[in-house]
Amino acid sequence: MRKNIVAGNWKMNKTLQEGLALAKELDAALKGRTINCDVIIGTPFIHLASIAAAIDTTRIGVAAENCADKESGAYTGEVSAAMVASTGARYVIIGHSERRAYYHETSPILMEKVKLALSNGLTPIFCVGEVLEEREAGKHFEVVARQVEEALFTLDQTDFAKLILAYEPVWAIGTGKTATADQAQEMHAHIRKSIAAKYGKEVANGCSILYGGSCNAANAKELFSRADVDGGLIGGASLSVDKFLPIIEAF
């Protein structure tokens, strides 16, 4: 079901103690407020169980930032979708541009992660996006549609409907650059059109598509006002309640 969502992505930040304090501070800040979106925080693996136990998870959903593409076994250092689910987390970020770039995660790998997440009752937040060279070459629509198609279009309609998508213009992450609200809307509409062509309009119109590129308190309201922008996947600003809360309240 299509929802407004603001999801934080802490990346590789915060010790366990710092993360627990931040999650509790956010939980306290949201208590008693009227919030018009679902709030999720994506944290490093070591935080998941402690945070899920310490906050009201009906108020704030907890997400892992990744999971393994294997079910279990001799994969030293990996964390399976089943392990993530056992912590009390309900979501997992898959396919973030940093995972694609630094750890060479390809569509076949991401497809396995999505399937394992779904089979363990997790909701994937699946990321797609183009780099600057692809946008400047006019290939951005083609690239993003292909990322969606290659990793997700083997899913049946029921499973696809469980996904949250996030569009991250890679050239706008951590650079201070932001896609304009019109650029975001244009790409989100293109993604939704691609979904409709495969699964039909009902599934496409029921899919939440978040914007994930340097979204902050100053631009969130304008971005979220666009018809196909259903919220944000927030990086740096999610590390501070003072910066994250105004984005949540932009709806």
Curated annotation (Swiss-Prot):
GO CC terms: cytosol
Catalytic activity reported: D-glyceraldehyde 3-phosphate = dihydroxyacetone phosphate
Pfam families: TIM
Binding-site residues, substrate: N9, W10, K11, G174, S214, G235, G236
Predominant place of localization: cytoplasm
Entry-linked CDD domains: TIM
PROSITE patterns: TIM_1, TIM_2
EC number: 5.3.1.1
GO biological process per UniProt: gluconeogenesis; glyceraldehyde-3-phosphate biosynthetic process; glycerol catabolic process; glycolytic process
Active site per database record: H96, E168
Enzyme class: isomerase
Pathway: Carbohydrate biosynthesis; gluconeogenesis; Carbohydrate degradation; glycolysis; D-glyceraldehyde 3-phosphate from glycerone phosphate: step 1/1
Keywords: Cytoplasm, Gluconeogenesis, Glycolysis, Isomerase
Annotated InterPro entries: Aldolase_TIM, TIM_sf, TrioseP_Isoase_bac/euk, Triosephosphate_isomerase, Triosephosphate_isomerase_AS
SUPFAM superfamilies assigned to the protein according to its UniProt record, in alphabetical order: Triosephosphate isomerase (TIM) (SSF51351)
MF terms (GO), sorted A to Z: triose-phosphate isomerase activity
HAMAP family assigned to the protein according to its UniProt record, in alphabetical order: TIM_B
Record function comment: Involved in the gluconeogenesis. Catalyzes stereospecifically the conversion of dihydroxyacetone phosphate (DHAP) to D-glyceraldehyde-3-phosphate (G3P).
Family: Belongs to the triosephosphate isomerase family.
Quaternary structure and partners: Homodimer.
Protein name per the record: Triosephosphate isomerase
Organism: Porphyromonas gingivalis (strain ATCC BAA-308 / W83)
The encoding gene: tpiA
